[in-house]
Amino acid sequence: MKTDINEEERAQLKAAAYRKEQQLEEFQQVKNGYLQLLENFNTTFNDLARDYEETVNDDLAHEAANEDELAANQELKQQTNRTIADQYDATNQLYNRIRRQSDGEIDDLNKQRSRLPWA
């Protein structure tokens, strides 16, 4: 029976592809955690902004300063929501780019492994 002269190299390529897949899974977990943190921050921030608006409305009903503060608070909420949405988009774009790159690297490793002659 002949021994496979490329067995070790084939095993190394398989291990490298597996490590790349593991790194991608870890990155996805980090991404999901980050997106959850963004969502939690956004929820908390909007709750606080709503509570602030209710307080201002209760304490200073119909004053011009009250209207200015409410308008400023609403603008801050909108800016925060836009920033959170931008962060979601940027994070997902980064993940998709890394995913495509990693998938390509994994495919290359698997192709290299498949091209090795058996002998």
Language-model features: locations:
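Charge-rich amphipathic alpha-helical interaction elements
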Residues: M1-A119
